[in-house]
Curated annotation (Swiss-Prot):
Its main location: membrane. It comes from the Bacteria. F(1)F(0) ATP synthase produces ATP from ADP in the presence of a proton or sodium gradient. F-type ATPases consist of two structural domains, F(1) containing the extramembraneous catalytic core and F(0) containing the membrane proton channel, linked together by a central stalk and a peripheral stalk. During catalysis, ATP synthesis in the catalytic domain of F(1) is coupled via a rotary mechanism of the central stalk subunits to proton translocation. It holds the Pfam family ATP-synt_B. GO terms for cellular component: plasma membrane; proton-transporting ATP synthase complex. Keywords: ATP synthesis, Cell inner membrane, Cell membrane, CF(0), Hydrogen ion transport, Ion transport, Membrane, Transmembrane, Transmembrane helix, Transport. The keyword Cell membrane applies. This is ATP synthase subunit b. The keyword Signal does not apply. The gene is atpF. It is found in: Cell inner membrane.
C-alpha cells in the first residue's frame, strides 16, 4: 500500500470537514430534528387529547339526548294521563247527567202514571155511580144486569 502526502492531506481535510460539520452544521440539524420530533409528539398528544375530548363531548351529547328522550317520554305520558283524566271526568259528568235525565224522566213518568190513575179512579167512580143509577132505575133482571155490566166494561 502506497501512503503518500495526498492521503494525509485528504485525511486532514476530512477531519477538518468533520470538525466543521460536527461543530457548526450537526447541532442545528439535530436541534431542528429534535424540534420536529417534539412538534410531532405534541401534535400526536394534542390529537389524542382532542380525541378524548371528542369522546367526552359525544358521551355528554348522548347523555343529553337520553335525558331529552326521557323528558319527552315523561311529558307525553303526563299529557296522556291528563287526557285520560279529562276523558274520565267527561264520562263521569255525562253519566251523572244521563242519570239525572233518567231520574227526571222516571219521576215525570211516575207523575203521569199517578195522574192517569187518579183520572181513571174519577172516571170509574162516575161510571159506577151511573151504573148504580141505571140499575136502581130499572127492575132487577139478570139479563139487563149483565148487559149493563158489559156496557160498563166497554166504557172502561
Amino acid at each position: 500500500m502506497n501512503l503518500n502526502a495526498t492521503f494525509f492531506a485528504q485525511m486532514v481535510v476530512f477531519f477538518i470537514l468533520w470538525w466543521v460539520v460536527a461543530k457548526f452544521i450537526w447541532p442545528p440539524l439535530v436541534k431542528a430534528l429534535d424540534e420536529r420530533a417534539k412538534k410531532i409528539a405534541d401534535g400526536l398528544a394534542a390529537a389524542e387529547k382532542g380525541k378524548a375530548e371528542l369522546e367526552l363531548a359525544n358521551k355528554r351529547v348522548d347523555q343529553a339526548m337520553a335525558e331529552a328522550r326521557t323528558e319527552g317520554a315523561q311529558r307525553v305520558a303526563d299529557a296522556e294521563k291528563r287526557a285520560q283524566l279529562t276523558a274520565d271526568e267527561i264520562k263521569q259528568n255525562a253519566q251523572a247527567e244521563a242519570a239525572r235525565i233518567i231520574a227526571q224522566a222516571k219521576a215525570e213518568a211516575e207523575q203521569q202514571v199517578t195522574r192517569a190513575r187518579e183520572s181513571l179512579r174519577d172516571q170509574v167512580a162516575v161510571l159506577a155511580v151511573k151504573g148504580a143509577e141505571q140499575i136502581l132505575k130499572r127492575e132487577v133482571n139478570a139479563q139487563v144486569h149483565a148487559d149493563l155490566l158489559n156496557q160498563l166494561k166497554a166504557e172502561l
